[in-house]
């Protein structure tokens, strides 16, 4: 079932209050996890510190698979932030949704293409920034004409394609999952005998959606590092 988004206009611009709320909640959750995991560091990690160190090691492995550590080590914090943010954002809409006067307030922020495409644009812009910073503007721009100059138009198209696919892949998977969860919940509420089937199917789909949300967080972070490697490594 489709629900309206709570929109407000300010200075000629339209803002989605639901997106703003859920983005803020996602940031707060990630911040709280990070603080809780690093508040009292110990030589023998336990609990949250152990989890956070595992996340760092996991992201370190992603970076090492795309570029050498001397080049990619500086992106460790970026990778950890991305994978935690996208994972939490993907999970928020799974347990429940909140509707007020026909408006959808509680959902996964990544179920909105505006959010995922904005995140993709920011990530791709960051790869360009580090490409210029680490290779120099002239050497960076020459990459668009290597190995032959006629590839320049194709490489420009590739930049737009990478941005679109990075954002839309994440949006499509999370949005489709929430739509199906809503349909199964509606089936369980309104269709009698089929209600039990709907409820059990919803639990199975929620478990699958957790898996999908986790994989999408990994893919988004991995592709970010792949794009970064293409911009900052001299052998690409």
Curated annotation (Swiss-Prot):
InterPro entries: ATP_syn_F0_a_bact/chloroplast, ATP_synth_F0_asu, ATP_synth_F0_asu_AS, F0_ATP_A_sf. GO terms for cellular component: plasma membrane; proton-transporting ATP synthase complex. It comes from the Bacteria. Coiled coil: none annotated. The chain crosses the membrane at residues 17-37, 75-95, 112-132, 174-194, 208-228. F-type ATPases have 2 components, CF(1) - the catalytic core - and CF(0) - the membrane proton channel. CF(1) has five subunits: alpha(3), beta(3), gamma(1), delta(1), epsilon(1). CF(0) has three main subunits: a(1), b(2) and c(9-12). The alpha and beta chains form an alternating ring which encloses part of the gamma chain. CF(1) is attached to CF(0) by a central stalk formed by the gamma and epsilon chains, while a peripheral stalk is formed by the delta and b chains. Key component of the proton channel; it plays a direct role in the translocation of protons across the membrane. Belongs to the ATPase A chain family. This is ATP synthase subunit a.
């Amino acid at each position: 079932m489709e629900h309206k988004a709570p929109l407000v206009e300010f200075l000629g611009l339209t803002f989605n209050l639901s997106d703003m709320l859920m983005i803020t909640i996602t940031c707060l959750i990630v911040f709280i996890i990070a603080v809780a995991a690093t508040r009292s560091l110990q030589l023998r990690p336990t609990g949250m510190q152990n989890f956070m160190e595992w996340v760092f090691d996991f992201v370190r492995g992603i970076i090492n698979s795309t570029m050498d550590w001397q080049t990619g080590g500086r992106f460790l914090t970026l990778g950890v932030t991305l994978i935690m943010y996208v994972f939490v954002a993907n999970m928020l809409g799974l347990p429940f949704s909140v509707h007020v006067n026909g408006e959808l307030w509680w959902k996964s922020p990544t179920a909105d293409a505006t959010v995922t495409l904005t995140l993709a644009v920011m990530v791709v812009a960051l790869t360009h920034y580090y490409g210029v910073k680490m290779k120099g503007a002239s050497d960076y721009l020459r990459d668009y004409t290597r190995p032959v100059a006629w590839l320049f138009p194709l490489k420009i198209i590739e930049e737009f394609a990478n941005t679109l696919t990075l954002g839309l892949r994440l949006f499509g998977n999370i949005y489709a999952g929430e739509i199906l969860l809503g349909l199964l919940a509606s089936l369980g509420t309104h269709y009698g005998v089929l209600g039990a089937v709907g409820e059990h199917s919803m639990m199975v789909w929620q478990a699958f959606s957790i898996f999908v949300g986790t994989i999408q967080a990994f893919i988004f972070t991995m592709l970010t590092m792949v794009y970064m490697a293409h911009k900052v490594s001299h052998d690409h």
